[in-house]
């Protein structure tokens, strides 16, 4: 847990783009199209940039233990299940808590952060109360369709950890 951490969110490329960065005219500040890149205007030199934004927020860094044997998809599922569990147990809106995958390509970790304006104190409460942290993990397990105590499949006819279970778009 880290209170008031500085978060930097980097936008590396266009969603459907292949190349990193964004080409802009250094005089106009306008983004350049592929057509404009083919015939550059010497009056408006082109520069490739990366866009970023930053914020200050409380964060909680979760490192799934290797013995879980989670694939990247498993860590992503855990990420969304933890977010959903926190939302439900703390009765907060989905926009008030967020998470990002971090770490190496071979071993991903989860960084949860409060995305509401100012601190809402949820992550601080979870970090300082091991019983609440355990409750979050138990709720996440339930959200994925299992009873932790009995290892029972709560919904045998439904897919586990489905879009409907984990996301709220």
Task: List each language-model region with its residue ranges.
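Extended, highly charged accessory segments
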Residues: 1-169
């Amino acid at each position: 847990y880290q209170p008031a951490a500085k978060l930097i969110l980097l936008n590396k490329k266009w969603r459907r783009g292949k190349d990193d960065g964004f080409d802009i005219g250094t005089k106009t500040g306008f983004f350049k199209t592929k057509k404009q890149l083919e015939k550059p205007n010497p009056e408006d030199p082109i520069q490739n940039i990366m866009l970023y934004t930053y914020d200050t927020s409380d964060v909680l860094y979760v490192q799934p233990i290797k013995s879980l044997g989670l694939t990247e998809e498993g860590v992503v599922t855990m990420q969304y299940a933890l977010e959903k569990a926190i939302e439900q147990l703390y009765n907060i809106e989905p926009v008030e808590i967020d998470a990002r995958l971090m770490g190496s390509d071979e071993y991903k970790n989860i960084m949860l952060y409060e995305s509401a304006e100012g601190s809402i104190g949820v992550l601080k409460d979870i970090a300082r109360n091991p019983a609440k942290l355990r409750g979050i993990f138990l709720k996440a397990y339930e959200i994925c369709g299992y009873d932790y105590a009995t290892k029972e499949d709560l919904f045998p006819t439904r897919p586990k950890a489905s879009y409907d279970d984990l996301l709220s778009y």
